[in-house]
Structure formats: structure tokens, C-alpha cells
Swiss-Prot record:
Biological function: Involved in mRNA export coupled transcription activation by association with both the TREX-2 and the SAGA complexes. At the promoters, SAGA is required for recruitment of the basal transcription machinery. It influences RNA polymerase II transcriptional activity through different activities such as TBP interaction and promoter selectivity, interaction with transcription activators, and chromatin modification through histone acetylation and deubiquitination.
Family label: Belongs to the ENY2 family.
Gene3D superfamilies in alphabetical order: 1.10.246.140
One term of GO molecular function: transcription coactivator activity
Keyword field: Activator, Chromatin regulator, Cytoplasm, mRNA transport, Nucleus, Protein transport, Transcription, Transcription regulation, Translocation, Transport
GO cellular component terms attached to this protein's record: DUBm complex; nuclear pore; nucleoplasm; P-body; SAGA complex; transcription export complex 2
Assembly and binders: Component of the nuclear pore complex (NPC)-associated TREX-2 complex (transcription and export complex 2), composed of at least SUS1, SAC3, THP1, SEM1, and CDC31. TREX-2 contains 2 SUS1 chains. The TREX-2 complex interacts with the nucleoporin NUP1. Component of the 1.8 MDa SAGA transcription coactivator-HAT complex. SAGA is built of 5 distinct domains with specialized functions. Within the SAGA complex, SUS1, SGF11, SGF73 and UBP8 form an additional subcomplex of SAGA called the DUB module (deubiquitination module). Interacts directly with THP1, SAC3, SGF11, and with the RNA polymerase II.
Coarse class of the protein's main subcellular location: nucleus
Alphabetical list of HAMAP family matching this protein: ENY2_Sus1
GO BP, sorted A to Z: chromatin organization; mRNA export from nucleus; protein transport; transcription elongation by RNA polymerase II
Protein name, per record: Transcription and mRNA export factor SUS1
Keyword Nucleus part of the UniProt annotation: yes
Domain of life: Eukaryota
Length: 101
């Protein structure tokens, strides 16, 4: 790892620690969960996982949690509505602007 990468990792760690200690992490996290719930994202991801389990069950194929997670995770990330992604990014930018100034 390069010195620049080490410094970047250290800054990232400090930001994460400050986000948590200031309570902003909980605020952003709760708002994100609410927005995802209201958008139906949780239901859609549950349906996706259930379909995958049913398909594998129909073929008498056992699926581990890790396999299911590997299948669902990228699709679930793509399913997050763009307005929610933008809102969370805006909240993080606002937080960073306040911390840096």
C-alpha cells in the first residue's frame, strides 16, 4: 500500500468515527431505511431473494447464505432508487462541508 493510500484510509476512518460519534451516522442511516421502506425496496429485495431460493429449490439445489447474498447484493444495490442515492449523497456532502469548514 502506498503512503497516499494509507493517508486516504486514515482520513476515511476519521470521517467514519466522527460521523458515528456526532450521531450523524444514525440520522442518515434511519432516514435511508425509511426512504427504502417507503419506496418498496425492502419488499422488492425480499421477492428477489425468494425467487432465487424457489428456483434453486425447484432444481433440488441447496443455496448457502453466502451464495444468496452474492446473488442478491449487486441487484439490490441497482434497485435503490436514484432519488434516494442522490439524497444520501447530498446529506453526506452537507455533513462533510460542515466538518471541513
Amino acid at each position: 500500500m502506498t503512503q497516499q493510500q494509507d493517508e486516504l484510509d486514515q482520513i476515511k476512518s476519521q470521517i467514519q468515527e466522527h460521523l458515528i460519534s456526532s450521531g450523524n451516522y444514525d440520522i442518515i442511516n434511519k432516514q435511508l431505511k425509511l426512504q427504502l421502506y417507503e419506496s418498496g425496496w425492502f419488499d422488492k429485495v425480499t421477492q428477489l431473494a425468494n425467487r432465487e431460493l424457489q428456483e434453486n429449490s425447484a432444481h433440488d439445489t441447496a443455496v448457502s447464505f453466502d451464495q444468496l447474498f452474492s446473488f442478491v447484493k449487486p441487484k439490490a444495490e441497482e434497485m435503490v432508487p436514484s432519488n434516494i442515492k442522490e439524497d444520501v449523497l447530498e446529506r453526506l456532502k452537507d455533513y462533510l462541508d460542515d466538518v471541513i469548514q
